[in-house]
Amino acid sequence: MDRCDFLPVSAEEMHERGWWWYDALVVGGDAYVDHPSFGTAVISRVLEAEGLRVAVLAQPDWHDAEAFRAMGRPRLGVFIGAGNLDSMVAHYTAAKRRRSEDFYSPGKRTGCRPDRAAIVYCNRAREAFGPDVPIILGSLEASLRRFAHYDYWDDSVRRAILFDAPADLLVYGMGEAATIEIAHRLKKKQSVHTMTDIPGTGYITRDPSVCKFDHITLPSFEDVRDDKRLYAEATRTEYAEHDPVRGRAMIQPCEGRYLVINPPAMPLDTRELDRVADLPYTREWHPMYEPLGGVPAIEEVRFSVIHNRGCFGGCNFCALAFHQGRMITSRSHASVIREVEAMTHHPLWKGYVSDVGGPSANFRHPSCRQQKERGMCPNRLCLAPTPCPNIDADHSDYLTLLRKLRQIPGVKKVFVRSGIRYDYMLCDDNDAFFRELVRYHISGQLKVAPEHCIDTVLDYMGKPHIGTYERFMDEYRQLNNKYDKEQYVVPYLMSSHPGSTLSDAVALAEYLNRRGRQPEQVQDFYPTPGTISTCMYHTGIDPRTMKPVYVAKTPHEKDMQRALLQWRRPDKRRLVIQALHEAGREDLIGFGKDCLVRPMTDRRKPAKAVEPQPPQRKYGKVYGGGKKPAAAHSAQNAKPGKSAKPGRAGKPGASGKSGGKPGSKPGRSGAKGGRR
């Protein structure tokens, strides 16, 4: 791929284009990958399509403002994003340990972006260009930290990010419409300080009367910092008003100034989404990364397609609804087909579309017909704990799209690897999509997210009850048998979510043990900014009901809950026994079929000594004495309802979990969805 196919990343590349000035500098916390799954690529291509000269500054040296001045002063402004993930999530695990790899950096190298990248980049840009160059802050990190928020890594409530990042405007959500509007006004020489009427943006002011929208005042930063009940009330209001149809602006006082968050922008319609998707992305990393081994994050999404936006799933631990919104919009069939046809000409194309998905793969239209006039229901989830009677569950359009993609010349297989909402799928009276999903679109494993088996915990999570998952699994097995498929389910499970007690974790381990499931990896609850579950973790209050909720906070209890879901691992044995003792479930320590672990006092008897036998000569060869070891064949991971094939173990992950989020490849708080 030639450098001229990308936007310029240096003064030299600008000069090769004959540019001696440029309009917009796009700063990103990830390596520059020109693919529609990467926020820097999307915003830079959107600005380019508006006729602007755009330069990209990816993962700059944040220690020196000179790195920001390397391409000169932009004529219009600086557009800053921290990357596809919150930088703290990208750098640290749920146990607050530093990650050893960064898939969004060249060669998986760590240390290519600072902690709290949005704040650091904004301060360096202001130092580099002074007060006269407008700075526009966006990306997931800024979006989810737009209000005063609990920060897990500091274990404290921080101010809204604009009070620490000296940007003139904050763009939250997906941001294309607001970014285009800001760029047009800057071209017309309008002062950025007068742009107070753009939906999907926020700013700081000393005079709250400048707000152009109907608004509501939230508890101040000082109040939510000092009073957990007020924090929970503020969270409830923030979610209730996050609606582009009926939502109001929100004002939050902070230390003598005021944060103003305007109502959300309307989601892009089909025509607008198609326009963004049809921009000339190269779908590759910039050639400057070749000597470093490229950027690994592209491997999972290079030949994937995002066909929708928004998520009405309502998972309380997921930030996607607070970022993208709950309204679903989707691309046209023609746009998706054009993208896949273009993929078939890529030099690395092997014939496989790795995913046709999004935050939730099988959402393609609004959840009900009332949303366009009334907005989303403020006090009702569409799917949990039971589906709303008004839900419009119809997969026919998605199924038609998949059928068309299968017919494109050069396409061998079209897979669906994003999370499937099985509860929504079961609401559809027509099972044609379910049948064809099993028959044509699973690459060996289907990702679903039951998360837990205890209904009270699932209610805190915003997930359907376990009976729905069991019904799905029964139908899934039947369809696999019908089509003679050996395909598995990868169930995502979560430990230590607010509301989950040690006894609940024991019950989940029992549930898995009885069904022969052995999850290999389990996601411990990660209190990321902006979610309802994080509010529960910090306050011990469910903001939806304002009632107390149990929270596992000590590292030891969190380790025990996680260990219980991996009870077969030898390194977890001691923790599992401790957990069972604390839960009063010593009956699960022993040798019975329902027991989880053996007692620690158990020691295998040493093998009986055998006298060595003299070598035996046979047909010119020497054989040692004793028996030859028999080949071991394991059936523990065999497909449910079938025996393991002779001489072949069942596939690993047949009934367990593989993979985890966030911080992995594009996902849990990134542009595409993870847990569903």
Q: Where are the regions a protein language model picked out?
A:
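Flexible glycine/acidic-rich beta-alpha junction loops that bind and position SAM and/or redox cofactors
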Residues: D86-A95, L144-R146, E176-E181, T205-S209, ...
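N-terminal pre-triad scaffold of radical SAM enzymes
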Residues: V27-Y32, L292-A319, Y352
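N-terminal [4Fe-4S]-dependent radical SAM core
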Residues: M1-W21, A31, R229-S304
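Intrinsically disordered, Lys/Arg-rich low-complexity segments
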Residues: R604-R676
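Conserved SAM/AdoMet-binding glycine-rich loop
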Residues: V26, V42, D61-W62, A342-V490, ...
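Terminal amphipathic helices with adjacent charged low-complexity linkers/tails
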Residues: H63, H193-H242, G256, A265-L268, ...
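Flexible, glycine-rich loop/tail regions that form catalytic "lids" or insertion modules at the edges
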Residues: A24-L25, R69-A70, I198-T201, E290-P291, ...
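Glycine-rich beta-alpha loop elements in corrinoid/cobalamin-binding modules
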Residues: E12-E13, G39, A58-C254, I261-N262, ...
